Each structure stands twice: as C-alpha cells, then as structure tokens.
C-alpha cells in the first residue's frame, strides 16, 4: 500500500536536515506543491479496513507496517526464517518528500530505506499466484496497491535491487 508521507517516522533525522529552529520547514518545493513543513504534517494512512477486506478473499502470508526502521528492519520481522524479500526499486512509487530529504540532507540511499517508508506504508505478502488478484481486489475496493517484489529462499532480510 502506498504511504501518505512520513507516517511520523524519521523526524529526528528530518529535524537535522531542515533545521526547524531556523525556519527550514517553511521552504516551498514545487514538487510538493507546499512547504516541507506542510508535507511533513500529512496524516498517517490507516490500512485496517483494506487489510481485513483482503483477508476475506486471499490468504495473507505476512503483513509488514513500514514504520521506523524502514524496509530493512520491518519486512524481515514478518517473514519466516530463511526467506528474503527481494524488492524492485523501480516498482516503488517513492514520494517527492523522500527525494527532497535525501538530496537536502545528502543521505545515502540505504539509510533512507532503513529510516523511512519511502512511499510504501504497508507490505502484504501473498502466494505468487494470488498477487495480481490481491492487487485487483484492493484497487476495486478503492485502495491503491501494487506489486513491489517477491520473496525467495536465502538469508533473512531484504534485498533492494
């Protein structure tokens, strides 16, 4: 599921990047259509209803809420031992706010994926044969969803490629 923004995670780092005490949050960015401060205050998306609706139709194998710790800490906790999540970076819909944070703070990409949700608020793992159906069900119910990768046997963790 796409995120609506930071979802209240990574604000310690964001404070350093934008120097809140000196008005850094009042800068307007064309790609946001607002100030960075307004973008940071975007309310957190809640996923309970779409997850429950999907669970009635498709067997969900794992759910990962991408909170503090980003991809590298949250996704592995939801997967069985010996399984890795292979995430296709090009499949992600990274929100402009994350690009701005990364560039302004000169933050390495791995740190961004280890701190922020990068535009993915929640990941749901289903069997490969159920993936397209799960996306269709969610979209038909009014919730945007898209496939960001797959799971594979291997070391526990996340591989972003």
Label each PLM-derived region with a short phrase.
Residues 21-25, 30-41, 45-161:
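Glycine-/charge-enriched secondary-structure boundary and capping motifs
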Residues 1-29:
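Phosphate/diphosphate-binding glycine-rich loops and adjacent basic-rich segments that engage nucleotide
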């Amino acid at each position: 599921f796409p995120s609506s923004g930071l979802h209240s995670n990574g604000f310690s780092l964001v404070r350093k990047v934008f120097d809140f005490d000196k008005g850094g949050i009042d800068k307007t960015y064309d790609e946001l259509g607002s100030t960075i401060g307004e973008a940071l205050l975007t309310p957190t998306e809640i996923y309970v209803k779409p997850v429950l609706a999907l669970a009635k139709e498709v067997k969900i194998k794992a759910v990962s809420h991408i909170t503090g710790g980003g991809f590298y800490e949250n996704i592995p906790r939801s997967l069985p031992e010996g399984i890795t999540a292979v995430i296709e970076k090009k499949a992600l819909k990274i929100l402009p706010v994350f690009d701005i944070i990364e560039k302004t703070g000169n933050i390495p990409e791995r740190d961004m994926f280890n701190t922020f949700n990068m535009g993915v608020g929640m990941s749901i793992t289903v069997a490969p044969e159920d993936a397209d159906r799960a996306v269709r069900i969610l979209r038909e119910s009014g919730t945007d969803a898209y496939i960001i990768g797959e799971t594979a046997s291997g070391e526990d963790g996340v591989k972003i490629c």
